[in-house]
Swiss-Prot record:
Organism: Rhizobium etli (strain ATCC 51251 / DSM 11541 / JCM 21823 / NBRC 15573 / CFN 42)
Enzyme class, spelled out: hydrolase
Residues of the signal peptide: none
GO process annotations (BP): adenine catabolic process
InterPro entries according to UniProt: Adenine_deam, Adenine_deam_C, Amidohydro-rel, Metal-dep_hydrolase_composite, Metal_Hydrolase
Protein name, as recorded: Adenine deaminase 2
Catalytic activity reported: adenine + H2O + H(+) = hypoxanthine + NH4(+)
Chain's gene name: ade2
Length: 595
């Protein structure tokens, strides 16, 4: 497989650079930068030793005995700190943080994250190929290394939902020709791959032909299905469901991306890995989705490593997974190791438990110090991303299910995340279905202008009692306008607030908007600062806590954003109706029988 690379601004194979580095390593020329007084974590052996490090341009020229050299243009005092390679986030979506790539880079670099593998499928689902091109251009000049992947499942479940675009194998192949694209992003249409669907087979084969990564999303796959998924050419997974699932997929040979957004499973994962007595070379780390308040308060991949250590993983294991193992997966021998001849991506941490970064170096340049950015970050014009929510105002009647008769039997979607089909009987009043006691409503309206925008309505059980409504255009993965609630009036109110804002999140209760976060860029992100976005998102959380009673780990706020992910097994509400990828069934209306 080819090395996975963006178009690096500094070529390590430049003969002049190598000649300068060799001369400096011999002692015949000074270093550009010399880091002294620190201790070095060897990501391969896990050992910590005292060492000084000499840099020439973007290259590590020397790792040598402490105080044995003093000749350098700039000397950095690392006393008391521990030096590691820059952290590598193996799977993430910038859009989940609801800020621009430039703002995201400014957030994670001060935490020691120097490389991320970004699947821009949220932009792809809304803006199509132009959205992916915008993401590539936005990432190109940032001091954060962003390796983009070609979104493989746009939409996630063809025929069951309608997104803003449709990426077939020809579109994927076009993206893969870009040096900025490192492979095929998480293949979520598992059933299509396993069943040999021509569309999905062609997409995976495009990735294989490119020699680049083919990444997976193998939630719930076992036995013959897992073997078939891997036999098609998929080589990784971040959708682990238990410690037993982790053990099985490690044994199967998948590269594992331990996912920080599944915090309730991390301790179980640590116990499994500790039981092995060693860290497999195929274990890496990822954030996947980090909300803006979490990013602002805690950071990115450093927080995943920090929690793993808190749950009992050896710090050197967590950092190896986040550096050397990740670089090996990417076939990037220049990354993931502090050694002569490698790329100068370095982090100086205060210690190996709290992992607070004192200094961050990327390509031999100081980009952040003591939690603040020092490198310039140039944002890209966001004008191409506006006006993506193409819906007229909605009314209360749009959030009711019409029916004639006295009573009705309806289909329901039971419980968050691991959904199941259910049924309920209820009455019909004034020509509309009365929501069954204890249920909530979910409505999805197509917002991309490719079909009518009348919401399709479903009924949720196991979601608790709703005392208001929540509307979002962040709704994986087609990102149609999605509304939850127990009252049609509040649902219409929240929906219209979001439509007026051009996309975003809104909470309504008792006929009034309680909180709103406008996301006018693709209905996914804002060009506001992370600080302001985090504050507004926190207000949304607080408002949501007042209208619904959560029950972790599955009935949680985050579940609202994945309730329409139709590629996952079981029934999910989409803009087409209640869809089940396992059977291919779509119910345009939840009404099954009228009495």
């Amino acid at each position: 497989m080819n090395a996975i690379a963006r178009q690096e601004p500094f070529d390590l194979n430049d003969p002049a650079l190598r000649a300068r580095a060799v001369a400096a390593a011999r002692g015949d020329a000074p270093f550009d930068m010399l880091i002294t007084g620190g201790r070095l974590l060897d990501a391969v052996t896990g050992l910590i030793r005292e060492a000084d490090i000499g840099l020439v341009g973007a290259l590590i020229a020397s790792v040598h005995a402490p105080a044995s050299r003093t000749d350098a243009v700039e000397i950095i005092d690392a006393t008391g700190g521990i030096l590691t390679p820059g952290l590598i986030d193996m799977h993430m979506h910038v859009e989940s943080s609801m800020v621009t790539p430039a703002e995201y880079a400014s957030a994670v670099l001060p935490h020691g994250v120097t490389t991320v593998v970004w699947d821009p499928h949220e932009f792809g689902n809304v803006q199509g190929l132009d959205g992916v091109r915008w993401a590539i251009e936005a990432a190109r000049t940032l001091p954060l290394r962003m390796i983009l992947l070609a979104p493989s499942c746009v939409p996630s479940a063809p025929g069951l939902e309608l997104a803003g675009a449709d990426f077939d194998a020809a579109v994927i192949a076009e993206m893969l020709r870009s040096p900025a694209v490192g492979g095929v992003a998480e293949v979520m249409n598992m059933r299509g791959v396993i069943d040999g669907d021509p569309r999905m087979s062609a997409i995976v084969n495009s990735g294989l032909a490119s020699g680049k990564l083919v990444c997976g999303h193998a939630r719930g796959l076992t036995g013959a299905d897992l073997n078939a998924f891997m036999a098609a050419g998929v080589t990784s997974d971040h959708e682990l469901t238990s410690g037993a699932d982790l053990a099985a997929k490690l044994s199967a040979g998948l590269t594992i991306e331990l996912r920080g957004s599944h915090d309730h499973l991390l301790q179980e994962f640590v116990e499994v890995l500790n039981g092995l007595g060693h860290l497999p070379a195929t274990v890496t780390l990822c954030t996947d989705d980090v909300f803006p308040d979490e990013l602002y308060q805690s950071g990115g991949l450093d927080e995943v490593a920090r929690r793993l250590v808190r749950y009992g993983m050896k710090p050197e294991w967590a950092l190896r997974a986040a550096t050397f193992n990740a670089a090996q997966r990417l076939k990037r021998s220049d990354l993931g190791l502090v050694a002569s001849g490698r790329r100068a991506d370095l982090v100086l941490f205060e210690d190996l438990t709290e992992l607070r970064a004192r200094l961050v170096i990327s390509d031999g340049r100081i980009v952040a110090r003591n939690g603040s950015m020092e490198a310039a970050v140039q944002p890209l014009d966001t004008a191409p991303l506006i006006n993506s929510t193409k819906l007229p105002p909605l009314t209360e009647s749009d959030f009711r299910v019409p029916a004639k008769g006295a009573r009705v039997r309806i289909a329901t979607i039971d419980r968050p995340r691991f959904t199941q089909w259910g049924e309920a009987e209820t009455e019909i009043r004034d020509g509309f279905v009365v929501p069954p006691a204890g249920s909530a409503m979910i409505a999805v309206a197509h917002r991309h202008g490719k079909a009518g925008g009348t919401p399709r309505i479903g009924f949720l059980t196991g979601w608790g009692e709703w005392r208001g409504a929540f509307c979002t255009t962040v709704s994986h993965d087609s990102h149609n306008l999605t509304v939850f609630g127990g009252d049609a009036r509040d649902m219409a109110l929240a929906a219209n607030a979001v439509i007026k804002a051009g996309g975003g999140l809104a909470v309504a209760k008792d006929g009034a908007i309680q909180a709103i976060l406008p996301l006018p860029l693709s209905g996914l992100v804002t060009d506001a600062s992370l600080k302001d976005t985090a504050s507004a998102f926190s207000d949304i959380r607080k408002a949501m806590d007042k209208i619904v009673d959560w029950k972790p780990p599955y009935r949680v706020f985050k579940a609202c954003f994945g309730a329409t992910l139709a590629c996952n097994a079981g029934p999910h509400q989409t803009d087409r109706g209640i869809a089940d990828v396992t059977t291919g069934k779509v119910l345009e209306s939840p009404v099954l029988e009228i009495f």
